[in-house]
Each structure stands twice: as structure tokens, then as C-alpha cells.
Swiss-Prot record:
GO-annotated biological processes: translation
Keywords, in A-Z order: Ribonucleoprotein, Ribosomal protein, RNA-binding, rRNA-binding
Cross-referenced NCBIfam families: L9
Name of the molecule in the record: Large ribosomal subunit protein bL9
InterPro entries reported for this sequence: Ribosomal_bL9 (IPR000244), Ribosomal_bL9/RNase_H1_N (IPR009027), Ribosomal_bL9_bac/chp (IPR020594), Ribosomal_bL9_C (IPR020069), Ribosomal_bL9_C_sf (IPR036791), Ribosomal_bL9_N (IPR020070), Ribosomal_bL9_N_sf (IPR036935)
Function noted in UniProt: Binds to the 23S rRNA.
GO cellular component: ribonucleoprotein complex; ribosome
Lineage summary: Bacteria, Thermotogati, Deinococcota, Deinococci, Thermales
Annotated GO MF terms: rRNA binding; structural constituent of ribosome
UniProt xrefs under PANTHER family: 50S RIBOSOMAL PROTEIN L9 (PTHR21368)
UniProt similarity note: Belongs to the bacterial ribosomal protein bL9 family.
Annotated source species: Thermus thermophilus
């Protein structure tokens, strides 16, 4: 029996693959759990349409990431914080950086995609990587300065 996988399964394949399985396995395990659908002509057409739509969305996201890269790589984000000699009071997190970028330059980013291993706790210049798309990493320059 041919089925279209809706979830990646270790022994069968990835999402969207058409695989041939035993009828009992399909009827008793894959279909009731929503892991696969029968490979009918209408389901195959729906799968093709979904694949085309997903490819279009990925291309749009990549184009948006390229546009964002042109904007972000040419600027340095300055974040003023309360500080002593070199240490700051508190820390600067990815969320703080995203808010400052939105406030100062009107650019909105997802803080979860900003590679910041631990919060910034000292004054200085930092180069962070932002990944809005897996193929488009962006180097963002951040300057943490003492508030006057």
C-alpha cells in the first residue's frame, strides 16, 4: 500500500515521501496516528501544491533575509547602559538588542535567532551573528557604552 508521509519516520523516510508499506502497518499504525495519508491522486496533487507553496515561502524568506543583511551589516548598534569602570549593572540580552535595533533603526528581528551564548556583562564592541535564514548569516556590530 502506498502512503504519503506527513511526519519524518526513522525507518521509512521524510515528510512528503511516497513509500510502499504493508497494508496492516498503514491501516493500524500510520493512518490512525496521522503520520501518513493514502497516496491517492488527489492527495498527490495536494502534496505537490503544498511543496510548491513551501518553496515559494522559502524563496521569499531568503529574499527578505538578503534585504535585511544589506541593512544590518552596514550599521553599528549602540546600546547605552548604566555601568561602573568596565562592568555594567545587569546585562544586555538578545531581547535588549532586538528592542534597541527596533527603537534606533526601525528594524525588527527575532531575538531567538541572534547567536548570543550568554548575556553581555561588560562594556565594549561585539560582533554577533543573526540568522534569519539558514543560508544568510548576518554579522551585527553592537557597541555597549556607558550611559551619561
Amino acid at each position: 500500500m502506498k502512503v504519503i508521509l506527513l511526519e519524518p519516520l526513522e525507518n521509512l523516510g521524510d515528510v512528503g515521501q511516497v513509500v510502499d508499506v504493508k497494508p496492516g502497518y498503514a491501516r493500524n499504525y500510520l493512518l490512525p496516528r496521522g503520520l501518513a495519508v493514502l497516496a491517492t491522486e488527489s492527495n498527490l496533487k495536494a502534496l505537490e501544491a503544498r511543496i510548491r507553496a513551501q518553496a515559494k515561502r522559502l524563496a521569499e524568506r531568503k529574499a527578505e533575509a538578503e534585504r535585511l543583511k544589506k541593512i544590518l551589516e552596514n550599521l553599528t548598534l549602540t546600546i547605552p547602559v548604566r555601568a561602573g569602570e568596565t562592568k555594567i549593572y545587569g546585562s544586555v540580552t538578545a531581547k535588549d538588542i532586538a528592542e534597541a535595533l527596533s527603537r534606533q533603526h526601525g528594524v525588527t528581528i527575532d531575538p531567538k535567532r541572534l547567536a548570543l551564548e550568554k548575556p553581555i556583562k561588560e562594556l565594549g564592541e561585539y560582533v554577533l551573528t543573526y540568522k534569519p535564514h539558514p543560508e544568510v548569516p548576518i554579522q551585527l556590530k553592537v557597541s555597549v557604552v556607558a550611559q551619561e
